[in-house]
Amino acid sequence: MRNLRKIRLTVLSAVLGAFFIMSEKSSEAAVVVLETSKGQVEIEMKPELAPNHVARITELVKQGFYDGIIFHRVIPGFMAQTGDPTGTGTGGSGENLNAEFTDYEYVEGTVGMARAMNPNSADSQFFICFEGCGHLTGQYTVWGQVIDGMDVVRKINEGQPPAEPDQIVSARMKD
């Protein structure tokens, strides 16, 4: 009887241990890696804030949509914007998303969705804040936060559009 209890406890411990290891791995945040003409930027996705936007960005990244797209609007002290395949600020993937506004405060490195006047017009364009952009909080969907490479973001050429625009050479999901 004692041996049976030991076996049951051992099996239970192994199952619970495996469960905790699996849950820990699955709870790791997804990260988008942007290889830009200035260097690498890593963005931790925030599905708890904007699940539909995170799903769409993930889909576009996996399709290679962002590869070769320029940073078409870069305003010093404010943000760098990309995600328009036409490079004009008027293009997108053709699929609008409904707003997922939250009270997550826009700080340095916050990544939000660009949109037109219609709150439900976000598509594929996004921007990265150079510093606090608190006035955007609750008005633009946040889907990520730069966790590495803000020094790279700060080096992106300025302009609307820049005379010599930097680009996303490739975008991928981090393994």
Where are these regions (language model features)?
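Cyclophilin-like peptidyl-prolyl cis-trans isomerases
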Residues: R2-D175
